[in-house]
């Protein structure tokens, strides 16, 4: 498993048919839930002792706990079931639990939540689906609570460094753990952390053999976002369905 993660951590960018929308949000939702604690830690190359995994986790918690909002460019890479696809766009997060994934490439689509309900909108297909956020089992979901109140060490069992995995950017550290209550869906999660205690990359190794990667860049903190960014009303002529756990 570690060998597959190591080789496919920087997943290829071949277009693919869309995977199930079911697995991706619950994790990133309970996950972009990082918070609480700690102060500044010192990283390799700064001339001091290396931090331990607890210090890194606490610093990540502290960084995101102080934020009211976050904007980032994201790249989502999926490999599994003979499918390979890369998508990208803009991510907006706002306390408490609000998120907007605005996919712009290769096709436009929107995944948005007001903290209570979530919508997936496919404009090219004129389709929209709605689900309660509590019932949603999607790997994007934990990210909604990145600005929340949960400690990283409580979210991930067996948290440790992953020195065998190549970092996206030199100087970053990679953490490895298993998300609690998701052992049936996720074998392990890898989190790449910058020296500034920001999350740069998340890799999710599914029990079905899939690998989903999220890369976050150009992060902008504490911007003012209108509440309308996190609401959705289906345009006229849109076919509306319930539930996001299907393909």
Which positions does each model-derived feature cover?
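Flexible, processing/modification-adjacent segments and terminal tails
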Residues: 50-78, 84, 122-187, 234, ...
